[in-house]
Each structure stands twice: as C-alpha cells, then as structure tokens.
A protein has these predicted regions:
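FKBP-type peptidyl-prolyl cis-trans isomerases
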Residues: 1-110
Length: 110
C-alpha cells in the first residue's frame, strides 16, 4: 500500500458500495456490484467517485472515513443518521443508518 494518506485538500478517488443494515445495496460505483444487486443502469458511468476532502461534497461520515486512508486500502464503516442524511428531513434516507465499503484508488495532492 502507498504511504500517502488522504488529508483535507486532497482529491480522493474512491469506489464504494452503500448498503442498509439488512444488507440491501442502495448505491455503488462498481458495475459488478450494481449488476449483482439488481441496480445496474446502462446510462450510468461506473467509475470511482472523486471527492475533494474538506469541501463537504459528500455526507460527513463518508468524508471522515476517507481521511487517513491510503491508496488500495479498503474500509467498512457504519454511519448513523447524524453522519449521513440527518435524523429527519425531506431526503429519502433521513433517519437511516448506512453502511459503506470504501476502496481508495487514487489520492491527488493539490
């Protein structure tokens, strides 16, 4: 594994699988996982998500989980509603605990 660790300001490329606690996949950046979960969409471009850490481009728990990760590192995290879409609100995932499997594929320093 690379010794470079993700920090604020870095652009991190990350593959992910998002699941509910029961194991049902709700989103993924990986084509094979989408096919397996019955979520495959021909119009979607399955590739790593690019996130600039510290810019709040993704839910807070997702961003926090990426901090300190290395290239080719995999991590599984459980995000309570407070670290995802909040306890309540209009978002369909508000109030839900979410699980993510993350795989960092690249880290680019500014």
């Amino acid at each position: 594994m690379s010794e470079v660790t993700a920090q604020n300001g870095d652009t991190v490329s990350v593959h992910y699988v998002g699941k509910f606690p029961g194991g049902k996949v709700f989103d993924t950046s990986m084509k094979a996982e989408a096919v397996k979960a019955g979520l495959f969409n021909l119009a979607r471009d399955y590739k790593p998500l690019q996130v600039v850490l510290g810019k709040h481009q993704v839910i807070s728990g997702f961003e926090e989980a990426l901090l300190g990760m290395k290239i080719n590192e995999t991590k599984e995290v459980t995000l309570p509603p407070e670290k995802a879409y909040g306890r309540s609100g209009n978002h369909p995932m508000a109030g839900k605990t979410l699980l993510f499997r993350l795989l960092v594929t690249n880290i680019k320093r500014p």
